[in-house]
C-alpha cells in the first residue's frame, strides 16, 4: 500500500494553466516561483500533482485539542487622548457606517473590548476630554459630557457582548491627589453617569493613572470599597496600565494575597517596545516567568499606535505580527490598540494614527484602512472564550517574528482558526487533530494589494492540508463561516473645511461640545448666558492634575483648516476673569500662530506665538459688557480690532498658515458668534 500523499496548495494567477507533470527540475521550480510572484488580486487555490517532490519539509502546525492554552479575551481599542473627537460630528448615514466598521461583529474590525478615557479637562495626548464632574459639587449629579459614553453605547448597540472599560489620564483639580478617596468617588461617578444616562454597565476599571502606575493600597482602602458600596461590585479591576516597571506588580501581589485577589488582570503598554518599532527588537519587556506562572490574565492594554493606512513598515502587517507575537511569546490574552480611529485634525500630534480614518465630518468622507482587515483576521474568526492551542502557536522561522502563527479553538463546538502572518514565501502543513471540526477549511487572505479576500475552501485529506504561502501576507484558515468584508459603498469625496464658517451656538443643547471644535486644554461647552441666548463657555475653573508636563498654551480649542492663511477671525467675548484670545495660523502646539488677546481690565496684546508684537490699554473699558474681537491676517500684515476699532497693525514675515482657535484663562469666559471669512491674497488684492 502506497503512503498517503497530502495535496500541495499554491496560489496561481486566475486563468493560468497548471501542468499535471511532476516538477523535477529546480529551474522549473524557479520559473514557477516567478509566475507565483506575479500574483496580485486575482488568483485561485489549486492543488498540484501528488507527484511533486517537495523542495523542503513544510512547517507543521498541529492542532491538538488537548494542547494547553489560555483563554482568548479579545482584541480591543482604546478611545482616549481626544483621538475620537471628530467622529460624533459626522452626519448620518456616514457616522453609523463608521461605527459598523469598528464594532459590528463579522463586518469590519469587530473590536471586542473598548476602553475609554475618563476625561479631566486637561490634555491627554491629542487634546482634552471633558470631565463628568468638573467640580466636587457635580459629583452629586455627574454630567454625560463628551463622546466616550456615547461611543460605548454605540459599540454595545452593535455588539451586546463588547467588554467596556475606562481609565483616566489626568484629574480635575478638586480631586487633590490622584490616589485619594475623592479620586475613588470620581471613578465611581463615571460609572454612575454611564448607568443613568446610557444604561451601560461597565465590566472593568483600569485602576490606575494612564502610564503613571497605581497604588494598590488605594485600590484596597478606597476604590474597591467605593465601588462595592454603590452597586458596582461586579466591576473588575485591571492594573497597573503602565509603560514602565514591567511586570513588577507581581512582586507585590505575590506578597499580599488580599491585594492579589483584588486585581483581575494585569496590563502593560508597549510590551514589545516603541521606537524604533521593529518586530524583532529586544526591548527587555517580555512577560516574566512569575507573571506567566501567576495564572492571572495578562493584557497588552495599549499597543501599536501607528497608522493603519499603510500595509508594510509599521502599519497593518506589523500589527498582525504583533498580535500573534504577544500571545506566543508572553501569553498575553487581550490586545488593545490606541486608537480605534484617526478622528482628529491632521496637524494635531499623533494625527494619522488608528485602524481607520474619519477626520472630515463636514463632508462625510472616511477611509477604511488596511488595519481594519488585519484586525478582522482574528476578531472575525475567534470570540472571547475561545482557547489558544499553545502547541500550535509559534514562529515560522525561529530567528524572526516576521512570520508566525496563532491557533485557537472553540471549546464548545470544536471549531478552530489559525492566523498566519508571513515574512518570506514558504510552505505550511496544518494537521487537524481528532475532536476538532474536520469539514472544509475556509481561507481568507490579505496582502498589500488586496485585504480580506476570501479564497476557495479546501478539503482536508487525511486530516491535513499543505499550503504554499505568499510573503508579507496575513492568512486565516478556519472551520467557521459567516465572515465578510463588510462594505457600505463609497463614502462622499474629501473636501476642505468650509470657508466662510460661522457658529452662533443656538442649535445645540446646553452642555454640548459644538461641531468641529477640538479642545486642546480646558473644556469649551455650550451654555446659556443671562441674556437668554446661547454661547460657548470655558468651564474648567482651575488647572487639574496633569498627565505629563504642561507644555501647552492656556485652555484653548481649535477649528478650521491647516491651509488657512489670508482670512479674518472674529468673535464676541464676555470676560469673567483673566483674559481671552482669538487666534489664527495655528500649525501645531509648538507653532501657535497669531494671537489677539484681551484682558478683563482692558489691556490688549498682539502676539506671534509667545512673542509680543504690539500691546496697549483700552480707555474706559467696561469689563461687564460683551466686546467684539477681530483678527485680520493678510500676507505679512496682521491687524487686531476690538469693538470695530483697529488697535494694531504689524508686518511680520512668518508667512505661516494654519487653523483658528479660541483661548481663555481658567475662568468662565464666554464666546459667541464665532466667524471666519476669507480675504483675497495680498497679490490678488492689488489693482
PLM regions with names:
Residues 647-676:
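Flexible glycan-contacting loops in extracellular carbohydrate-active proteins
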Residues 300-382, 387-398:
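Aromatic/acidic polysaccharide-binding cleft in carbohydrate-active enzymes
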Residues 540-605:
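Secretory/extracellular carbohydrate-interaction modules
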Residues 183-204, 211-306:
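Active-site neighborhood of glycoside hydrolase catalytic domains
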Amino acid at each position: 500500500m502506497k503512503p498517503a500523499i497530502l495535496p500541495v496548495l499554491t496560489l496561481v494567477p486566475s486563468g493560468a494553466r497548471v501542468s499535471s507533470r511532476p516538477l523535477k527540475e529546480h529551474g522549473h521550480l524557479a520559473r514557477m516561483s516567478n509566475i507565483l510572484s506575479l500574483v496580485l488580486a486575482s488568483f485561485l487555490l489549486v492543488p498540484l500533482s501528488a507527484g511533486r517532490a517537495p523542495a523542503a519539509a513544510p512547517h507543521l502546525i498541529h492542532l491538538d485539542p488537548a494542547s494547553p492554552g489560555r483563554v482568548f479575551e479579545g482584541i480591543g481599542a482604546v478611545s482616549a487622548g481626544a483621538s475620537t473627537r471628530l467622529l460624533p460630528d459626522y452626519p448620518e448615514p456616514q457616522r453609523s457606517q463608521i461605527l459598523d466598521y469598528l464594532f459590528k461583529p463579522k463586518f469590519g474590525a469587530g473590536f471586542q473590548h473598548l476602553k475609554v478615557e475618563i476625561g479631566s479637562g486637561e490634555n491627554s495626548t491629542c487634546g482634552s476630554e471633558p470631565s463628568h464632574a468638573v467640580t466636587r459639587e457635580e459629583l452629586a449629579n455627574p454630567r454625560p459630557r463628551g463622546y466616550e459614553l456615547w461611543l460605548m453605547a454605540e459599540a454595545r448597540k452593535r455588539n451586546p457582548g463588547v467588554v467596556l472599560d475606562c481609565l483616566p489620564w489626568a484629574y480635575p483639580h478638586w480631586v487633590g491627589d490622584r490616589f485619594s478617596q475623592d479620586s475613588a468617588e470620581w471613578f465611581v461617578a463615571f460609572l454612575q453617569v454611564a448607568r443613568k444616562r446610557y444604561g451601560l454597565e461597565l465590566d472593568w476599571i483600569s485602576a490606575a493613572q494612564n502610564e503613571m502606575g497605581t497604588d494598590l493600597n488605594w485600590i484596597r482602602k478606597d476604590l474597591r470599597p467605593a465601588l462595592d458600596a454603590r452597586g458596582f461590585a461586579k466591576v473588575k479591576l485591571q492594573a497597573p496600565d503602565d509603560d514602565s516597571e514591567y511586570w513588577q506588580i507581581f512582586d507585590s501581589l505575590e506578597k499580599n494575597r488580599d491585594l492579589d485577589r483584588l486585581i483581575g488582570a494585569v496590563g502593560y503598554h508597549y510590551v514589545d517596545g516603541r521606537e524604533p518599532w521593529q518586530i524583532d527588537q529586544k526591548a527587555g519587556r517580555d512577560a516574566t516567568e512569575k507573571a506567566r506562572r501567576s495564572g492571572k490574565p495578562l493584557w497588552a492594554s495599549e499597543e501599536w499606535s501607528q497608522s493603519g493606512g499603510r500595509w508594510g513598515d509599521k502599519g497593518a502587517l506589523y500589527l498582525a505580527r504583533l498580535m500573534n507575537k504577544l500571545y506566543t511569546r508572553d501569553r498575553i490574552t487581550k490586545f488593545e490598540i490606541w486608537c480605534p480611529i484617526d478622528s482628529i485634525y491632521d496637524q494635531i500630534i499623533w494625527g494619522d494614527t488608528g485602524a481607520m480614518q474619519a477626520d472630515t465630518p463636514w463632508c462625510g468622507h472616511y477611509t477604511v484602512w488596511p488595519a481594519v482587515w488585519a484586525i478582522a483576521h482574528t476578531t472575525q474568526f475567534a470570540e472571547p472564550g475561545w482557547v489558544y492551542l499553545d502547541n500550535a502557536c509559534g514562529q515560522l522561522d525561529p530567528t524572526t517574528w516576521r512570520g508566525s502563527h496563532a491557533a485557537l479553538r472553540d471549546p464548545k463546538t470544536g471549531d478552530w482558526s489559525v492566523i498566519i502572518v508571513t515574512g518570506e514565501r514558504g510552505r505550511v502543513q496544518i494537521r487537524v487533530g481528532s475532536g476538532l471540526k474536520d469539514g472544509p477549511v475556509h481561507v481568507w487572505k490579505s496582502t498589500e494589494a488586496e485585504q480580506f479576500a476570501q479564497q476557495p475552501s479546501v478539503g482536508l485529506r487525511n486530516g491535513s492540508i499543505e499550503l504554499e504561502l505568499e510573503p508579507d501576507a496575513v492568512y486565516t484558515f478556519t472551520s467557521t463561516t459567516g465572515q465578510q468584508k463588510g462594505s457600505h459603498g463609497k463614502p462622499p469625496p474629501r473636501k476642505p473645511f468650509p470657508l466662510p464658517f460661522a457658529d452662533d451656538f443656538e442649535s445645540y443643547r446646553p452642555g454640548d461640545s459644538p461641531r468641529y471644535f477640538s479642545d486642546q486644554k480646558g473644556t469649551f461647552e455650550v451654555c446659556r448666558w443671562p441674556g437668554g441666548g446661547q454661547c460657548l463657555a470655558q468651564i474648567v475653573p482651575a488647572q487639574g492634575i496633569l498627565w505629563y508636563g504642561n507644555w501647552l498654551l492656556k485652555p484653548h480649542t481649535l477649528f478650521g483648516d491647516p491651509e488657512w492663511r489670508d482670512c479674518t477671525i472674529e468673535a464676541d467675548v464676555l470676560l469673567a476673569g483673566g483674559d481671552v484670545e482669538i487666534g489664527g495660523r495655528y500649525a501645531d502646539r509648538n507653532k501657535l500662530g497669531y494671537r489677539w488677546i484681551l484682558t478683563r481690565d482692558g489691556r490688549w496684546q498682539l502676539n506671534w506665538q509667545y512673542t509680543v508684537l504690539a500691546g496697549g490699554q483700552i480707555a474706559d473699558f467696561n469689563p461687564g459688557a460683551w466686546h467684539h474681537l477681530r483678527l485680520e491676517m493678510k500676507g505679512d500684515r496682521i491687524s487686531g480690532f476690538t469693538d470695530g476699532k483697529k488697535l494694531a497693525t504689524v508686518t511680520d514675515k512668518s508667512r505661516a498658515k494654519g487653523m483658528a482657535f479660541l483661548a481663555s484663562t481658567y475662568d468662565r469666559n464666554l464666546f459667541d458668534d464665532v466667524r471666519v471669512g476669507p480675504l483675497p491674497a495680498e497679490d490678488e488684492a492689488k489693482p
